[in-house]
Amino acid sequence: MHNIFKGLITALITPFKDNKLDLYALERIVKHQIKHEVDAVLIAGSTGESSSLSFEEYKLLLQTSVEIVNKCIPIISGCSSNNTTYARALAAESTKIGVDGFMASPPSYVKPTQHGIYKHFEALHEACNLPIMLYSAPTRSGVDFSDETILRLSKLPRILALKDCGVDLERPLRIRATVKKDFNILTGNDEVVLAFNAQGGVGWTSVASNIVPNICKELLEKWNKNDTKGALEIHQKLLPLYTALFVESNPIPIKYAAHYLGLCENEIRPPLTEASDSAKKQIENIITSLSIKI
């Protein structure tokens, strides 16, 4: 099975207007990614406010994204839930709609054991025939995969990758030493992309690339061509942007940044709230200093 989980994957925001999906803005957002040749887009992940979506909204979001992309790049859907039955339904619907793969985290809040995490993903694996990326987000889930559980899950034929949002930079080396060769490991933290890939990662699921996909793509291309100096120069330039985009809970800052650049409304669903005035100012200043334009 072809492994689509590599390179630059943008964790897309979900645009809203008047508390409904803004499909016109979604088209702008997705086409901006296609224009700059990202390797894939992730729909309805944490950055996409997936927990705020109804099942009908989830289906509409995926269906519209598939139509817009029209097979130009792979689409990855988020299928995280603390209810295994509901997560299976998301995976089955993703398959029916025609996405290219999906991502899921361990069930949040309920704090399953490692055996429970394994059984959850085994159930998702059985629910569809799509490639799957594990999503390690311990600060959001409250639990994480152990190295042993990752190894067990990697033996299931369609579990092909791990997106790691943790801070253990030795983990890619440890995992790489045990899993099958075609199992990919990507970082979900913009600020550690180079350090992570130096330790065995093969890509990056990025928040910042919602607004600077061209720069993020250039950074990764330089890294992959062994132009370490060039990659570091770009990374250093982007560090203040990474900081600004996480000055408050994701996706609050990136939603405002996208709004400021004309991609969408600055509408975010409760219990999240709009960026504070100080956060807005910080975001505006870095966008101006980097001359970011859409």
Curated annotation (Swiss-Prot):
Xref: Gene3D superfamilies: Aldolase class I
Source domain of life: Bacteria
Q: Which GO terms describe its molecular function?
A: (R,S)-4-hydroxy-2-oxoglutarate aldolase activity; 4-hydroxy-tetrahydrodipicolinate synthase activity
Q: Which UniProt keywords apply?
A: Amino-acid biosynthesis, Cytoplasm, Diaminopimelate biosynthesis, Lyase, Lysine biosynthesis, Schiff base
Instruction: From the UniProt record, give the pathway where this protein acts.
Output: Amino-acid biosynthesis; L-lysine biosynthesis via DAP pathway; (S)-tetrahydrodipicolinate from L-aspartate: step 3/4
**InterPro entries with a match to the protein in the record:** Aldolase_TIM (IPR013785), DapA (IPR005263), DapA-like (IPR002220), Schiff_base-form_aldolases_AS (IPR020625), Schiff_base-form_aldolases_CS (IPR020624)
Q: Name one Pfam family in it.
A: DHDPS
Where in or outside the cell? Answer: Cytoplasm
Site (Part of a proton relay during catalysis) at 46, 109
**Active site (catalytic residues):** 135 (proton donor/acceptor), 163 (schiff-base intermediate with substrate)
**Key word Hydrolase present:** no
Q: Residues that bind pyruvate, according to the entry?
A: 47, 205
Q: What is its EC number?
A: 4.3.3.7
Catalytic activity reads: L-aspartate 4-semialdehyde + pyruvate = (2S,4S)-4-hydroxy-2,3,4,5-tetrahydrodipicolinate + H2O + H(+)
Complexes and interactors: Homotetramer; dimer of dimers.
Q: What protein family is recorded?
A: Belongs to the DapA family.
Alphabetical list of PANTHER family matching this protein: 4-HYDROXY-2-OXOGLUTARATE ALDOLASE, MITOCHONDRIAL (PTHR12128:SF66), DIHYDRODIPICOLINATE SYNTHASE (PTHR12128)
> Could you identify this protein by its name?
4-hydroxy-tetrahydrodipicolinate synthase
